[in-house]
């Protein structure tokens, strides 16, 4: 049976040498297969969960993270502390019913809190992450030593479970088939030991060939296939490492790009500059035959550089970009692969590796995200297969792996530990059941305090293109170490809220100087237009998207200001000023005014805001409204809030609640879920947004309908059902936040109970 190990418990006896940590591994989460673990009842539950997912896999794409529930001893059919409540349509929602629902929800949710104080949950969704890992481990010859047979079996289970009915795989688990998803996952299965004619492999191969073959894969896919040896480097558009030698004042210097963009293209440029290809094995030779509609030696690689299957083409290359890549390919690259210009190429490669090592060491070899994690691992092996850097990388592979009833996946980060915990604290506090769940809050409080980043990155931040970090919070763990603006804001809000509660219940408050450090970071992140981006200041211009080579993703080249990040920061600064007047008060006031103007400017004419990190208009609507309220705006004095309420109310479903499809993100048009079904997370976001805007004073009917939906949807054990995917990044790729299904219904019902049902 698979068991989740967290924190220091996740470190084996022989692992300590190759696992660096500045926090005693706080928040680390690793799944380990324990053959003797689990009772007969638990093993039966695991079998049932797997079978149920597989049988319904074409209709329900999300796992329910049932392995966590099973491990922590909460059976799905068991009730909480109080009996379940079901309200009839039109029945009055009484406070007792809400309190009963909340008690059951918190009884369940507190029971799955980890010993470190955070909540561990599925952060999967993208279907291109696992194949990259498999390819890198295969090329470096460590696939079977890093991944046990149980890991490999679960990975195959996952890939098969998320194969679409047409035989292909999507960009993410709910998406239609793409060449990027299909070719990479087909390759992953082959490298994991699947025979070319086993199971659904022929159907997958047919999809690939029927859609033109793997020459139509996106640029990221072309790179992975080139590394493996089943695609030629001459079929890639150039990624010259010399960009890292350019002066910083140039607007297209990599240091000015969004950190995820530059940290992915950094190792890609190294591999491209090296033209690295792994060992040509029998499987590689076979894949050269399996993936293409014409013989491998007859493929026109120059033409293939700009070939992209129409199913993948979310962001088509502008003509100017094709001309640029063509010039670099035909003129620049022939020069820089020969003496004397080759000496500059060698210097550029050395510079790239210096930046790779800096990133690795500052994240304890976790890295910013899963893509650059695996690419950096590969680069370290290419540089020196016997290096300590490579060995340190291998020990962090398992930080990204998550197993559930749908199999083992690679997550979009090393977890969402701090993010989910900060939200969970705010949700629990909203219920006013603090005395009942003091131990839960105390553990969560300790986790938040210990997760704060307490030092800046070493060295000159200008050399390594880093922002100040001291006082910030990360998305996941302190060992990961990258600051994010809204994570800092939510972490600060959670710490401030708990500081208002009795210390004997929730523990000692965070020291004032550390709160001030967080405020200093937030103030340093405001852009000229008043908005806040994600990781850093916006360092260049939107026109740089003209050179975005990733056909699958939108708005990736620079770090844009976001409604969500701006609103969260406004709330945190407002609460801080209220509780700690005197620290940079005038600057905080000015920042909030400028941020409010940014939110109003970002609002669309129909009253909506586009959400960049959640699905989509409901998510951004919640943030937009509460940000303006934090700035002192009200429904009566702010047209933007009135328009936002009108927009959200216009999307209410006939039976109550809201249900928004991920297609809203992709197409930038509000789209209901298929069949006009409500979604509990969307409903919770809108319920909180409308409460914040004073809807109860005008017409509470939509609020009552939403609350009734949440209560009636609760499961017998107090859990809430997992529904469609609710996270997004780069406009077009969805990501799972499994904890959201509990956090936001609890939070919304807490707000509803104490701000709407006042009697």
Curated annotation (Swiss-Prot):
The lineage of its organism: Eukaryota, Viridiplantae, Streptophyta, Embryophyta, Tracheophyta. One of its GO terms (molecular function) is cucurbitadienol synthase activity. Oxidosqualene cyclase involved in the biosynthesis of the highly oxygenated tetracyclic triterpenes mogrosides and cucurbitacins. Cucurbitacins have cytotoxic properties and exhibit deterrent taste as a defense barrier against herbivores. Mogrosides are nonsugar highly oxygenated compounds used as high-intensity zero-calorie sweeteners; they also possess pharmacological properties such as regulating immunity, lowering blood sugar and lipid levels, protecting the liver, and acting as antioxidants and antitumor agents. Converts oxidosqualene to cucurbitadienol. Keywords: Isomerase, Repeat. PANTHER family: TERPENE CYCLASE/MUTASE FAMILY MEMBER, TERPENE CYCLASE_MUTASE FAMILY MEMBER. The keyword Isomerase applies. It comes from Siraitia grosvenorii. This is Cucurbitadienol synthase. It comes from the Eukaryota. Belongs to the terpene cyclase/mutase family. C.sativus and L.esculentum expressing S.grosvenorii genes SgSQE1, SgCS, SgEPH2, SgP450, SgUGT269-1 and SgUGT289-3 accumulate siamenoside I and mogrosides III and V, thus providing a strategy for vegetable flavor improvement or for heterologous biosynthesis of mogrosides.
């Amino acid at each position: 049976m698979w068991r989740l190990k967290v924190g220091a418990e996740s470190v084996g006896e022989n692992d300590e040498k190759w696992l660096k940590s500045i926090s005693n591994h706080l928040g680390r989460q690793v799944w380990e297969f324990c053959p003797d673990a689990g009772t007969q009842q638990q093993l039966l539950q695991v079998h049932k969960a797997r079978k149920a997912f597989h049988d319904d896999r074409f209709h329900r794409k999300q796992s329910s993270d049932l392995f966590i529930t099973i491990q922590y001893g909460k059976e799905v059919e068991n009730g909480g502390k109080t009996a379940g409540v079901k309200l009839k349509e039109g029945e009055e929602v009484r406070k007792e019913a809400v309190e009963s629902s909340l008690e059951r929800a918190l009884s369940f949710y507190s029971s799955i809190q980890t010993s470190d104080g955070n909540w561990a949950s599925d952060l999967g969704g993208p279907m291109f992450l696992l194949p990259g890992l498999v390819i890198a481990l295969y090329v470096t010859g460590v696939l079977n030593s890093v991944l046990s047979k149980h890991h490999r079996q679960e990975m195959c289970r996952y890939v098969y479970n998320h194969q679409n009915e047409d035989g292909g795989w999507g960009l993410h688990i709910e998406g239609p088939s793409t060449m990027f998803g299909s070719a990479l996952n087909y390759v992953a299965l082959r490298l994991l030991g699947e025979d070319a004619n086993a199971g659904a492999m022929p159907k997958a191969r047919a999809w690939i060939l029927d859609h033109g073959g793997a020459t139509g894969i996106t640029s990221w896919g072309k790179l992975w296939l080139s590394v493996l040896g089943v695609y030629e480097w001459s079929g890639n558009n150039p990624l010259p490492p010399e960009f890292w030698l350019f002066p910083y004042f140039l607007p297209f210097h990599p240091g000015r790009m969004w950190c995820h963009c530059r940290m992915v293209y950094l190792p890609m440029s190294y591999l491209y500059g090296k033209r690295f290809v792994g060992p040509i094995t029998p499987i590689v030779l076979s894949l050269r035959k399996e993936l293409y509609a014409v013989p491998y030696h007859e493929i026109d690689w120059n033409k293939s550089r700009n070939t992209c299957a129409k199913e993948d083409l979310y962001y088509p290359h502008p003509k100017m970009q094709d001309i640029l890549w063509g010039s670099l390919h035909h003129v620049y690259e022939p020069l820089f692969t020969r003496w004397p210009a080759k000496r500059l190429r060698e210097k550029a490669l050395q510079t790239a590796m210096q930046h790779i090592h800096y990133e690795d060491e500052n994240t304890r070899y976790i890295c910013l995200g899963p893509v650059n994690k695996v690419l950096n691992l590969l680069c370290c092996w290419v540089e020196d297969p016997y290096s300590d850097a490579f060995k340190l990388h291998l020990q962090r592979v398992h930080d990204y792996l998550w197993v559930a009833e749908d199999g083992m996946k690679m997550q979009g980060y090393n977890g969402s530990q701090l993010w989910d915990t900060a939200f969970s604290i705010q949700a629990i506090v909203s219920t006013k059941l603090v005395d009942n769940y003091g131990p839960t809050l105390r553990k969560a409080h300790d986790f938040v305090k210990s997760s704060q980043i307490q030092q800046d990155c070493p060295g000159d931040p200008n050399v390594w293109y880093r922002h100040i970090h001291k006082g910030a919070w990360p998305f996941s763990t302190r060992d990961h170490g990258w600051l994010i603006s809204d994570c800092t804001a939510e972490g600060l809000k959670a710490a401030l809220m708990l500081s208002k509660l009795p210390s004997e219940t929730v523990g000692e408050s965070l020291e004032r100087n550390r709160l001030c450090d967080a405020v200093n970071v937030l103030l340093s992140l405001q852009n000229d237009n008043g908005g806040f981006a994600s990781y850093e200041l916006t360092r260049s211009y939107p026109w740089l998207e003209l050179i975005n080579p990733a056909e699958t993703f939108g708005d990736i080249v620079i770090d844009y200001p976001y409604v969500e990040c701006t609103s969260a920061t406004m709330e945190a600064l407002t609460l801080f000023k209220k509780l700690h007047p005197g620290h940079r008060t005038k600057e905080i006031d000015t920042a909030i005014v400028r941020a409010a103007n940014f939110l109003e400017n970002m609002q669309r004419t129909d009253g909506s805001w586009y959400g960049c990190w959640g699905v989509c208009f409901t998510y951004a609507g919640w943030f937009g409204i509460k940000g303006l309220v934090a700035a002192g705006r009200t429904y009566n004095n702010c047209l933007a809030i009135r328009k936002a309420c009108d927009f959200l109310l216009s999307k209410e479903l006939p039976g109550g609640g809201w249900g928004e499809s991920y297609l809203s993100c992709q197409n930038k048009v509000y789209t209901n879920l298929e069949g006009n079904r409500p979604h509990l997370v969307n409903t919770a976001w809108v319920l909180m947004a409308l409460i914040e805007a004073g809807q109860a004073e005008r017409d509470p009917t939509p609020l009552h309908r939403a609350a009734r939906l949440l209560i009636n949807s609760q499961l017998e054990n107090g859990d809430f059902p997992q529904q469609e995917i609710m996270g997004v990044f780069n406009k077009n790729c969805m990501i799972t936040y499994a904890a959201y299904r509990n956090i936001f219904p609890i939070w919304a019902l807490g707000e509803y109970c104490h701000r709407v049902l006042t009697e």
